[in-house]
């Protein structure tokens, strides 16, 4: 599959692993946890094992969230997670990491295309990420996990974002690092671009039907 570049009139971005370097942040935390146990795996680096563990966890966790969504239990699960998050929240809000080249990419793209965020994150942390890097002015719409009745991999947030931008879904490009992003985009009728800056693998993204795959999100500037 290849992208139909002239068809693209708007670009929709996932956050974690696409704009935000969340995956390396999680891997770094797990690596610090694993380092004292390095005698268990002396021939392998803690960083490599941390990344593989998170990759192994990501697909099942997406499946569980999709099931909760389908059973109309996602709102209840979200309230529980919010309560736990508030109970454990540090006095200083966490600082986010951003994928290399993303700021320049977005500052260039938003003058040529309407842009939107389509994330499975909660609204508070999504907006905090955008504000930390002064990216909010780049986006005409922000869809989070609670914006629509169903979240990714259902098409609802992609369709919602397209409506907010005033662009038909088939003229949108959904950019993300997991099969959940690709499935959501395809089911909405949008073109899809998989990026390898997160934990989705090239083979997974191709099987899901991504129209194009790039090593990094910043590489999109070379395509459009």
Question: Which functions belong to the PLM regions below?
Answer:
Residues 114-116, 191:
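Proline-centered loop/turn at the N-terminus of a beta-strand
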Residues 3-103, 111:
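N-terminal helical cap/lid subdomain that shapes the substrate entry/recognition surface
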Residues 1-11, 107, 123, 127-224:
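Asp-based, Mg2+/Mn2+-dependent phosphohydrolase catalytic module
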């Amino acid at each position: 599959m290849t992208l139909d570049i002239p068809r693209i009139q708007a670009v929709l971005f996932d956050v974690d692993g696409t704009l935000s370097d969340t995956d390396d942040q999680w891997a770094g935390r797990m690596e610090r946890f694993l380092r004292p146990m390095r005698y268990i795996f002396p021939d392998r680096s803690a960083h490599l094992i941390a990344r593989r563990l998170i990759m192994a966890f990501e697909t099942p966790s997406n499946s569980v969230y999709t099931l909760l969504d389908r059973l109309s239990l996602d709102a209840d699960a979200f309230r529980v997670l919010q309560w736990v998050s508030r109970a454990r929240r540090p006095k200083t809000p966490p600082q986010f990491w951003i994928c290399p080249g993303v700021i320049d990419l977005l500052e260039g793209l938003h003058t040529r295309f309407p842009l939107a965020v389509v994330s499975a994150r909660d609204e508070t942390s999504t907006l905090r990420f955008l504000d930390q890097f002064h990216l909010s002015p780049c986006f005409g719409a922000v869809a989070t996990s609670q914006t629509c009745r169903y979240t990714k991999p259902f098409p609802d947030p992609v369709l919602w974002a397209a409506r907010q931008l005033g662009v038909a879904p088939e003229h949108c490009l959904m950019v993300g690092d997991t099969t959940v992003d690709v499935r959501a985009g395809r089911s909405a009728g949008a073109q899809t671009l998989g990026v390898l800056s997160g934990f989705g693998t090239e083979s997974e993204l191709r099987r899901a039907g991504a129209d194009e795959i790039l090593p990094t999100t910043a590489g999109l500037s070379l395509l459009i």
